[in-house]
């Protein structure tokens, strides 16, 4: 748009690249940031650069971390015989909020979606298989309750069953078509409690 200076338009474009942010919201965020004191803008930009520079994926589970392995994988009080498989790192935050699960996680970084051109080789399934050893008794599949999540869950069940590990799926207290990120703690706790074997 010609009525904004190039620097403002560029900032709007960058905000609009974020998921769920359209042009109008990006415009509001840009104008908000421009009205902040310079020191706050500097702190924000430094925090962004520092997070991007120091945060990496845990070599064990695939969660975001600044230390490898992450705090969950390195915690001796976590039950390492149970692995909860989730689609994205943000889903760990949702599961941890319920304070009902004491196992470890495996982040797939996606799901199987033929419509989007994502197959089993595009998510972290080989890494999951490598983690299945004699010490793992159960794999809880907590993928989102949508078509892609169900396809992913069934595929995981198919590849893990021959390894002799119990594979369960969280119960559908979580609304079909919804994301774990938006489920409340009680719903997630009930879904975890009512998981079923696949």
From Swiss-Prot:
Keyword tRNA processing: no
Keywords: DNA damage, DNA recombination, DNA repair, Metal-binding, Zinc, Zinc-finger
Entries under Pfam families matching the protein: RecR_C, RecR_HhH, RecR_ZnF, Toprim_4
GO molecular function annotations of the record: DNA binding; zinc ion binding
GO terms under biological process: double-strand break repair; recombinational repair
CDD domains assigned to the protein according to its UniProt record, in alphabetical order: TOPRIM_recR
NCBIfam families recorded: recR
HAMAP family per the UniProt record, alphabetical: RecR (MF_00017)
Family from the record: Belongs to the RecR family.
Summary of the function given for this chain in its UniProt record: May play a role in DNA repair. It seems to be involved in an RecBC-independent recombinational process of DNA repair. It may act with RecF and RecO.
The protein, known as: Recombination protein RecR
Lineage: Bacteria, Bacillati, Bacillota, Clostridia, Eubacteriales
């Amino acid at each position: 748009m010609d009525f904004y200076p190039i620097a403002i338009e560029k900032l709007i474009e960058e905000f609009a690249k974020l998921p769920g942010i359209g042009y109008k919201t990006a415009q509001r965020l840009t104008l908000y940031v421009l009205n902040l004191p310079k020191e706050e803008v500097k702190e924000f930009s430094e925090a962004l650069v520092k997070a991007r520079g120091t945060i990496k994926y845990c070599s064990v589970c695939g969660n975001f971390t600044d230390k490898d392995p992450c705090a969950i994988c390195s915690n001796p009080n976590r039950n390492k015989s149970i692995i909860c498989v989730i689609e994205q790192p943000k889903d760990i935050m949702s599961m941890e909020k319920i304070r009902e699960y004491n196992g470890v996680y495996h982040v797939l970084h996606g799901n199987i979606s033929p419509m989007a051109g994502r197959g089993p080789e595009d998510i972290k399934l080989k890494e999951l298989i490598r983690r299945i050893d004699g010490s793992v008794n159960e794999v809880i599949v907590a993928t989102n309750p949508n078509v892609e999540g169900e396809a992913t869950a069934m595929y995981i069940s198919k590849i893990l069953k021959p390894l002799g590990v119990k594979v369960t799926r969280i119960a559908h207290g979580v609304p079909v078509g919804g994301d774990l990120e938006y489920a409340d703690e009680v719903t997630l706790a009930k879904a975890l409690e009512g998981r079923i074997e696949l």
